[in-house]
Amino acid sequence: MVLIRVLANLLILQLSYAQKSSELIIGGDECNINEHRFLVALYTFRSRRFHCGGTLINQEWVLSAARCDRKNIRIKLGMHSTNVTNEDEQRRVPKEKFFCLSSKTYTQWNKDIMLIRLNSPVNNSTHIAPLSLPSNPPFVGSVCRIMGWGTITSPNETYPDVPHCANINLFNYTVCHGAHAGLPATSRTLCAGVLEGGKDTCKGDSGGPLICNGQFQGIVSWGGDPCAQPREPGVYTKVFDHLDWIQNIIAGNTTATCPL
């Protein structure tokens, strides 16, 4: 009986430790250097750290989140490690920025989207290539890929030298509506994460892509604080719902309006 109790206690301790450890793995593992050719990093002139991510959708345009807007944005493309420079890395600044609303008046559950026109086009290369816009809306149950240079621990922040990637699941919006106070009953956003916690986007990942079944379906918007908590999936701007606005802006119709 004593031996059984000892073994049972050891099992409980192991399970407890495993649960706590998994809660710290926010960004997953290092991304393969060849899987994020479309991923860009946003920073400001005086900053030493990237404050957001973005997605290159063609040679001249980047899609990110409105919350990522800053006065002096710089954009780095073709990067993997912050310590080792790729030969084909390129830097750009915005020529124009477009929003559904002013970046100061967007809501955390609606219209968190920013379309950036680069000051000059980029060329495809070993580490740079655009990601196509989605041809179909996502469906609940999809496996989705997240990536970025954001913190891999929370609430204490640890920023990696390379982007981290993880797989999460797409849930019905009602899951996020129940998890986060203040969310409206309907929204042009997606709800994605891992219900047991442990995998999530976090500070520094905003604006980056949510790729579901190979299609660019979401833009990292916001989530719980601390990040990666159980039953608190993240909220992502739904790209498919904004396709008409994006395509109109790119085509030159700069007065196009976003969906209500």
From Swiss-Prot:
Database matches in CDD domains: Tryp_SPc
Provide this UniProt record's keywords sorted from A to Z.
Disulfide bond, Glycoprotein, Hemostasis impairing toxin, Secreted, Serine protease homolog, Signal, Toxin
> What pairs make up the disulfide bonds?
C31-C165, C52-C68, C100-C258, C144-C212, C176-C191, C202-C227
| Glycosylated residues, chain numbering | N83, N123, N124, N156, N172, N253
Q: Which SUPFAM superfamilies match?
A: Trypsin-like serine proteases
Domain Peptidase S1: from-to ranges: 25-251
Superkingdom, natural source: Eukaryota
Describe, from its UniProt entry, the tissues in which this protein is expressed: Expressed by the venom gland.
What GO molecular functions are on record for this protein? serine-type endopeptidase activity; toxin activity
Return the PROSITE patterns for the record.
Answer: TRYPSIN_DOM, TRYPSIN_SER
Q: Where in the cell is it found?
A: Secreted
Matching entries from InterPro entries are given as: Peptidase_S1_PA (IPR009003), Peptidase_S1_PA_chymotrypsin (IPR043504), Peptidase_S1A (IPR001314), Trypsin_dom (IPR001254), TRYPSIN_SER (IPR033116)
What does the entry give for GO biological process? proteolysis
General function of this protein = Snake venom serine protease homolog that may act in the hemostasis system of the prey.
Q: Which family does it belong to?
A: Belongs to the peptidase S1 family. Snake venom subfamily.
Spell out the protein name for this chain.
Snake venom serine protease homolog KN4
